Amino acid sequence: SFTDFVSSGVTWLDPFKVVGDQFVSTLTSAGFIILILGGYTGYMSHIGANEVTVSVLAKPIAHIKSPYILVPITFLLGNLLSLVIPSASNLAIILMATLYPVLRQAGMSLLSAAAVIATTATIMPTPLGSDNVAIAAELAKTDMFSGLTASDYVFRYHVLVSIPTLLVMALAHYFWQKFMDKRAGSDLTDGDVDLAEVKAVEGSALYRTVYAILPLLPIIMLLIVFAITSTTGAKIDLSVELASILSFVIAIICELIRTRKGKETLAGTESFFKGMGGAMPIVALLVAASVFVVGLKSIGLITELQNAMTGLSGSG
């Protein structure tokens, strides 16, 4: 924080030292977790596990013919897929390529299909989300939430708000899209869209099952440990980064068994570190935000705002 800042001894160097200090602070806490998650996501894409998960989850939608029933289902499915594909832009591209033609073929209007896809990846309660990791790390610095982990934050606090909110949003989507289509006079029978099938995943049922689970394995581990510790009182310290690294090792073993090519499989683990590099812009955003806050504190603006808010609540 700004109160802990130690000057370099040269005034014009201090702003750069603040940036450097924030990088060190972020990369050794929330930033490291985000990089690990980015690496795991990158490896899941490399071995095709994300593709299997999308295929398994998206295929059943093609059998539902009612366009408005598909609206809340697609919204909730998109949020579920955000566990596997944390990038909102990448998720939107995948949904547009796979689900959008299915929705149009089922008779959903163009704007309704676009709207439901655009609003996915909103507030999914997952300890794998970079936003939740960052918030948990900041809360853990306070006395009230000292030692708070991302899992505790999500499963004890976030989920109480986000799950009901997601259900309300799904229901609101159903009525709102129906109302807007009726008002706009959309032609719901217009299905002149080539149905782009979700890419078929070849392999045995065991392969599809295991590889569909792999992208979700870290959160499954965290949920199981949280349930055990909550019900039995057992002390098991499974952090997000530990769950991700353990899942990474399990994924490598699965790849070794599937391909029977040790050299190629181990060479493919490079995608994990490339994924970490791909997550670096998220860490840079956290650093930029931290530097901005330090700047506000240095000019006393944060203190003045706190005093003003205290005065308002006192007079109220």
What is each residue range found by the language model?
Residues 6-101, 262-316:
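Membrane-embedded alpha-helical segments and adjacent helix-loop junctions characteristic
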Residues 38, 78-95, 100, 105-152, ...:
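Alpha-helical transmembrane segments and, especially, the helix-loop junctions at the ends
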Residues 2-8, 18-29, 151-160, 206-207, ...:
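Interfacial loop-to-helix junctions that mark the boundaries of transmembrane helices
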Residues 94-111, 227-241, 305-316:
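Hydrophobic alpha-helical transmembrane segments and immediately flanking/interface helices
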Residues 1-2, 156-271:
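Long, contiguous bundles of hydrophobic transmembrane helices that form the permeation core
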Residues 133-137, 177, 226, 289, ...:
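Juxtamembrane/transmembrane-helix interface segments of polytopic membrane transporters
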Residues 17-18, 137-152, 228-236, 295-311:
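Membrane-interface helix termini and inter-helical loops of multi-pass transporters
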